[in-house]
Amino acid sequence: MSSIKFHEKSLKEVTRWIQANEDINTETSLSSSSDSSTTIPVIDHLPARIPYATDLKRNPCHFQKCLISRLATTKMLSHAVDGGDIEVMGMLVGYTSNDMIVVKDCYSLPVQGTETRVNAHMESYEYMVQYLDAFVTKEDKIVGWYHSHPGYGCWLSNIDIQTQSLNQNYQDPYLAIVVDPKKSLSGNTLDIGAFRTLPSKDNNEHVDYYPLNIQLYQNSLDVNISKLKLKFKVDPAIQNNPNEPELMKELHECVENWFHAKKVMKSTVGFNAIGSTVVNETEIGNEDFTHERSNSISSTSSLTTRHTTDVEMDDQESAQSSLDIPANVIPGMQFQEAEIKHEYELKKKKLLLLKVKQYQKLRTYRQLFNASE
């Protein structure tokens, strides 16, 4: 998963939010700025890096401020909008300065979310470490995580509190940011909250949390974000196809049907082989019984006499018939196998075409951003 998905829908909605924040005062309960100007302040020189001292950990409310870059808020909101009604999750990158946590950037995680919760698995942690080693400078580090609450405000649920408390105790300083994409888009104001947990008292399972004062900032390069989005228009022919998840699901079903058909054919052939063996043993027993009876009772007719060579020939014919049975596949199985294979190839070609279009889209964005420099 890429660190940010610039889908056309997300671009338009995020651009609308940026324009609204440039024209309207951003004094809200969660994202209020001490600056009286109506624009996001431009800060090219960030506060000095001051590590989190060990003696300061005794104060659970040491951190009171959170400085978030415009780049990070844009990526978080774009990721949350792209998730729709499903919660999304990502990591925050930055550093600390006295009682302030500075969030310079963020990146999304490949997690499985629902409408009410999001869970990170082992693959997500591996991706987090690999991304950190490849794209984040040594001066910066992970300072927290973010996730979305689509339509139900910015706060920490019980699971969020447990997650934040665990990470805060293990790798403090650690911050939790919650973004509500639906309220942000409907109100044209970024609905965001930053929180930290408080230690429990008397080993009580109930853990409380407190909000941090949020201030947004941008540098001189961030000012051109809106202009780049409004200036260049992506060809609709290379937009992302919303049917990609459904296509991946259908491709997976084709593979499952293929293995299921193979399994059914194998089990049926084995059953036929077992049945033929039972029939063969029964025939041999009957022939032995007839042979013994012909030896004990004298017969005047040679037609009723069975020779040992006849029994051996019968055994060979029975064994030959038992070997021929597995070659007879289930009626219609060959047609079903060919149909599944054809459907699989068709879905694979469609998915390949989608990936080619996405690659063309990424190349287009790269050319646009390089041309603007």
Swiss-Prot record:
MF (Gene Ontology):
metal ion binding; metallopeptidase activity
Query: Where does this protein have compositionally biased stretches of type Low complexity?
Result: 295-306
Q: Which domain of life is it from?
A: Eukaryota
GO BP annotations listed: proteolysis
Gene Ontology CC terms: COP9 signalosome; cytoplasm
What top-level class of enzyme does the UniProt entry assign?
hydrolase
Query: What's the stated role of this polypeptide?
Result: Catalytic Component of the COP9 signalosome (CSN) complex that acts as an regulator of the ubiquitin (Ubl) conjugation pathway by mediating the deneddylation of the cullin subunit of SCF-type E3 ubiquitin-protein ligase complexes. The CNS complex is involved in the regulation of the mating pheromone response.
In Swiss-Prot or TrEMBL terms, this protein is called: COP9 signalosome complex subunit 5
**Originating species:** Kluyveromyces lactis (strain ATCC 8585 / CBS 2359 / DSM 70799 / NBRC 1267 / NRRL Y-1140 / WM37)
Q: Which gene encodes it?
A: RRI1
